[in-house]
Amino acid sequence: MNSNSTIGRTTLGESDTISLSFSEPSSSLNSRSTDVVFASTSTLVPQQGSLTSLPPVSSTATPTYYSTSLTYDETLHTSIDVSSTSTLVSSTDSSSSSEQDTYSSQYDPATSSYSIITPSMSIFSSTSPMSSSSSITSEWSSLTSTTPTLSSSATSLSSSWSSLSSPSSLLVSSSLSLSLSSSYSDTKLFSFDSRSSIFSPSTPTVISPSYTYLSSISATSFQISTTSELSSSWFSTISSPSTISNKDTTFPSSSRNTSTSFYSSSLSSTNDFSTISKSSKLSPSASSSTVSISTISVPTSSSVSSSSSKVPSNRPSSSSSSDDTTSAYSSTYTFQSLQSTTSSSIPPTTQTPSTSTISTSPIPTSSQVFNTVAISSSEDSKTIYYFYTQTYDITDSSTTFVTGLPTTIAVAKSEVTSFSAPSSTITADMSFYQHWLDGSLDNNKNQGTSKTNTGTIVGSVVGSVGGILICVLVVWFMLVRKRKAKRHFKENDSFCHEIGRRTGFPTTAQAKEASLQAQDSGSQQRNTETASANNPFSNEFNFKARGNPPPVPPPRNVTAMNGSFQNMRSNFMDQENRFSYGSSFTYSSLGSSTQGGFSTLSSNSIRLGRGLDNDISHDERNTVQNNSQGFLREII
C-alpha cells in the first residue's frame, strides 16, 4: 500500500525543532565456564613382593562429571541524536508510506553552531552564519542468545550432545538529511578519519532531498558437540592359602578403564552495518561545492581459543587404571561494520562505535593430586597392617609427574594407639618407579635383608668359635710355660745341684736314679752300691747309712802337739784341699789360734771325723773319708 501526500506551507517567523536519534554502539559478551570434578576414593592392596600374603582390601571409586556450561549474551546498540532549531521561512513536506520523507526549507540568515560528538573522536566546534545543533545517538537493537547449561553425570560407555542455533535479524530504517540555504560565504576544513570535507558557498545554495537506507544484518551460529567414552580396566591378583591342600589359589581378573572426553564448540557471528546515501543533487547559482565521502569501517575481529586437558595414567601394582581426558575448545567471533555516508554541505559524520568483549573460560587442564589419603587396616593377633596411598613425585631428565603408590605398614598392637598416613610427597627417580612396576622393589629389599642377616649369623658364629680357640691356646701356652719354668727352677737352682756341679757330679740325675733304684730289685741295689763308692753323694738322702759320730778327743798338750800339728796341716792341705770344706778347716780351725789350731772360744775342740784326727794313720784316714759323708753333711 503506497499513498503520497504533499503539504505546502509558507510561514514566516515560525520556529521549528527537528530531532533525530540513531543509536549504534555494538557490544558482545561471551562467557564460558566449565566444571569438571573427579572424586575418587580407592583402597588398594599391593599384590607384589613380600606383600602378597596380606589380607585383601576392597576398592571403591566414585567419579562425578559436570559438563561444560556455556552462556552467550550479545547486545548491539547504536544511537545517533541530531537536533536542530531554526526559524522557518518556507517549508514543503512530501511524504509516502514507503518511509521516504522529503523536506525542503528556506531559512533567513542566522547564526548556527555545529557540534559533532563520537565515542572515538574529540569534540569539534565551529561558528557559521547559520544556527544548528546536532548530536549523535539514534536507534538501538538488542540480540541476546543464551545456550542451555548442560550438566550430566556420566558413567555410561559413550555419550554425545550437539546443538546448533543460528539466529539472524534484519533491521532496515531510514535516515534524514537537511537541505539548508544560506546567503553567507564560509569556508571550513574538517578532518574525520583522515578524510576531508570542504564547503565553500558564495551564494545561496539549494540542496535537494537525499535518501538514506540503514540496514543491519546479524547472523549467529553456535554448535557444541561433546563425546565422552568411559571404560574401566583393573588388574588384581589375590592369593589365599588353602588349609586342606596346602596350596595357594590365585584369582586373576582384569578390565580396562579409559575415559576420553572431547568438547568442541564453534561460534560464528557476522554483523554487517551499512549506511548508503544516494540521489544527492546540487542546485547552486554560481557557487562551488565539494562533496566528500566519509567511510568508517570497523575491522573484522576474530577470537579463537582452544584448550586441551589430559590426565596421565596412574598404574599401581595391584590395579591399573588409565584415565585420559582430552578437551578442545574453539570459538570464532567475526564482527564487521561498514558505514558509508554521502552528503553535501557539512554533513554530521558519524562513526559507529563498536565494542566487543569476550570472556572465555575454557576447560582447564586438570591433573590428579592425591591430597586425601584413604587408610584401611587389617590385623591379626599381634600386628596391625595399615594400607594407604603414598604420593610420589617421579622426576627424570625429560619428564616429571606425580603418582600414588599403595604402601603397607606393619605395626605391633602394643606400640600404636592411632595412625595417620603421611601427607608429604616423596621424590624418587625413574628407576625407583621402574622397579616398582616390575615388582622387583620389595624382592630386592627382602633379598638384601636376608643376605645381611645370613652374613651376620655366619660372622658371629665364626668369630665366636675363633675367639674361644684363641683363648684356649693362650691359656694352654701360659700353663705349660709356667710348669716348665717351675720344673727348671727346682732342678737347676737347688742347693744340692750347685754342690754337685762344683764337684763334677750333678745331683739331679743321681737323685732320680736313687729313687728308682730303691724300688728295683737287689741286683740294681748292688749296682747302686758300686756306683756309690765312686760318687760321694749317692747316699746323700739315705740317712740310715750314716756312720756314728766320731769320739770326742781328749785334751792335748799344746807344746807337744805343735810338731804333729804342722805335719797334719801339711798332709791335710796336700790331700784334702780339693774338698769344699778345706778352706773352712784351714782358716777357721787351724789358723784361728796360736794354740795348736784349737779355738779359744770353745772349751771343746772341733771333731773332724774319722780319718782326719791326728791319731789315725794315713791309710785309715783315706778309707774313712771314702765311706763317710764329710763335714758338709754334718752341717746340713
From Swiss-Prot:
Residues annotated as carrying Phosphoserine in the record are: 628
| Compositional bias (Low complexity) | 19-33, 87-108
Membrane topology summary: Single-pass membrane protein
Entry keyword annotation includes Ubl conjugation: yes
Keywords for the protein's UniProt record, in alphabetical order: Glycoprotein, Isopeptide bond, Membrane, Phosphoprotein, Transmembrane, Transmembrane helix, Ubl conjugation, Vacuole
Q: Kindly list the places in or outside the cell where this protein is found, as annotated in its UniProt entry.
A: Vacuole membrane
TM ranges: 457-477
> Effect of gene disruption?
Leads to cell death when overexpressing the camptothecin mimetic TOP1-T(722)A mutant.
Residue ranges annotated as compositionally biased, kind Polar residues, are: 1-18, 510-541
What does the record say about induction? During G2 phase of cell cycle. Promoter is bound by the FKH2 transcription factor.
Give the positions annotated as glycosylation sites: 4, 257, 492, 557, 562, 626
Which GO terms of the cellular component aspect does the record hold? Answer: fungal-type vacuole; vacuolar membrane
> What family does the entry list?
Belongs to the TDA7 family.
* Annotated protein name in UniProt: Topoisomerase I damage affected protein 7
